[in-house]
C-alpha cells in the first residue's frame, strides 16, 4: 500500500532554502520511505501532529499530519533550535487546512 504525500507551501519553501545538502538528501529519502509506511524516528507532539526526526547536522525536524494512514501532509520543517516555534506553526497550519 502506498501512502499519498502532500506538502504545504511553507514546507516546500523551507526545504528549498535548506543549505545543508546532506540533510536535504536525508529528508527527501525519509519522505520516500513515508510513502511505503516506514515512518522511522517519529513522535507525537499533540493534536495529531507528529515530528519526524532526521539525525543530521542541527537535528532537522519535519512536522506532519497523518490522515487515516493513506495520506500524510508535510506541514513545515525546522531544526532543534526552532522546535517550539515550528510545533506552533504546524498546529496553526493544520487548523488553517481544517485537519
Swiss-Prot record:
It comes from the Bacteria. Pfam families: Gp49. PANTHER family: SSL7039 PROTEIN. This is Uncharacterized protein HI_1419. The lineage of its organism: Bacteria, Pseudomonadati, Pseudomonadota, Gammaproteobacteria, Pasteurellales.
